């Protein structure tokens, strides 16, 4: 099963919820040429792990393991039986700490794979309700939409009929820590009402129109704090690249 990456075309922060989590308004688009892969493979006879992930990257505290534990509260017997014979193979291609939602996409694909393999018969809303307990971007990947306006803490998804130009990507070898970038954003005083008003305009425009008519700093509130924390990102800010998420992946329209 393929776990596709995503890009944020705009990302506006509009306040906090009761848990002090950031509220956002964003346009997510699915990147179908950048993906991880998940599959079930036969378990090696000497493996003693109840749930084993075989991967080309370090898997400790992986969000998939958290999803397994969450599912096991309701489907413990089914999961134990499956993973007594199978391991999960995860081939990681999406850059890590790059603003492309790789971990969230992997988690969504794992939930979908378990729903299908174990015939759990969970509908989309039930899967989204589970995902809210795990992470903010997962709901978009569960939806299967190619483009959507995303709000709340990432759990409110509205499909958008979009016009998406070809994007040219650059993946800097810079590991941007999401929490650190958000913390840096919080050091500044922002007019959240103004941000929300801008977001309501952006939500009505196609991706093509957004990238043609607005500057990178206008579209993504996290670009300036990202460049402050990671000085090597400043050149991309100055050269009119657009930032996905909290970085470090950047892109331009391929002319």
UniProtKB/Swiss-Prot annotation:
EC number assigned by the record? 2.7.1.148
The protein's UniProt keywords, in alphabetical order, are: ATP-binding, Isoprene biosynthesis, Kinase, Nucleotide-binding, Transferase
**Catalytic activity field:** 4-CDP-2-C-methyl-D-erythritol + ATP = 4-CDP-2-C-methyl-D-erythritol 2-phosphate + ADP + H(+)
State whether keyword Lipid biosynthesis applies.
no
Identify the catalytic residues: 6, 137
Which molecular function GO terms apply here?
4-(cytidine 5'-diphospho)-2-C-methyl-D-erythritol kinase activity; ATP binding
Q: Which residues bind ATP?
A: 95-105
> Record's InterPro entries?
GHMP_kinase_C_sf, GHMP_kinase_N_dom, IspE, Ribosomal_Su5_D2-typ_SF, Ribsml_uS5_D2-typ_fold_subgr
What metabolic or biological pathway is this protein involved in?
A: Isoprenoid biosynthesis; isopentenyl diphosphate biosynthesis via DXP pathway; isopentenyl diphosphate from 1-deoxy-D-xylulose 5-phosphate: step 3/6
> Some GO term, biological process aspect, for this entry: which one?
isopentenyl diphosphate biosynthetic process, methylerythritol 4-phosphate pathway
Domain of life (superkingdom): Bacteria
Primary role? Catalyzes the phosphorylation of the position 2 hydroxy group of 4-diphosphocytidyl-2C-methyl-D-erythritol.
Q: Which family does it belong to?
A: Belongs to the GHMP kinase family. IspE subfamily.
Q: What is the protein name stated in its UniProt record?
A: 4-diphosphocytidyl-2-C-methyl-D-erythritol kinase
Organism of this sequence: Campylobacter jejuni subsp. doylei (strain ATCC BAA-1458 / RM4099 / 269.97)
């Amino acid at each position: 099963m393929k776990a596709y990456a995503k890009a944020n075309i705009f990302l506006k922060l509009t306040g906090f919820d009761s848990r002090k989590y950031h509220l956002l308004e964003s346009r997510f688009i699915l990147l179908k040429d950048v993906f991880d892969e998940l599959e079930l493979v036969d378990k090696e006879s000497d493996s003693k792990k109840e749930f084993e992930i075989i991967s080309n990257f370090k898997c400790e505290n992986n969000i998939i393991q958290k999803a397994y534990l969450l599912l096991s509260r309701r489907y413990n017997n089914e999961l134990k039986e499956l993973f007594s014979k199978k391991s999960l193979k995860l081939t990681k291609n999406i850059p890590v700490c790059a603003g492309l939602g790789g971990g969230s996409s992997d988690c969504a694909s794992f939930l979908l794979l378990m729903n299908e393999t174990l015939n759990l018969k969970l509908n989309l809303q039930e899967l989204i309700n589970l995902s809210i307990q795990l992470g903010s971007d997962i709901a978009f990947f569960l939806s299967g939409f190619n483009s959507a306006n995303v709000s709340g803490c990432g759990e409110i998804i509205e499909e958008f009929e979009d016009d998406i130009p070809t994007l040219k990507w650059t993946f800097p070898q810079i590991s941007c820590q999401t929490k650190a970038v958000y913390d840096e954003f919080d050091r500044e005083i922002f007019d959240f009402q103004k941000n929300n008003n801008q977001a309501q305009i952006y939500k009505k425009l196609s991706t093509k129109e957004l990238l043609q008519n607005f500057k990178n700093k206008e579209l993504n509130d996290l670009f300036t704090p990202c460049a402050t924390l990671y000085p090597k990102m400043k050149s991309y800010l100055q050269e009119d690249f657009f930032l996905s998420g909290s970085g470090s992946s950047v892109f331009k329209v391929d002319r």
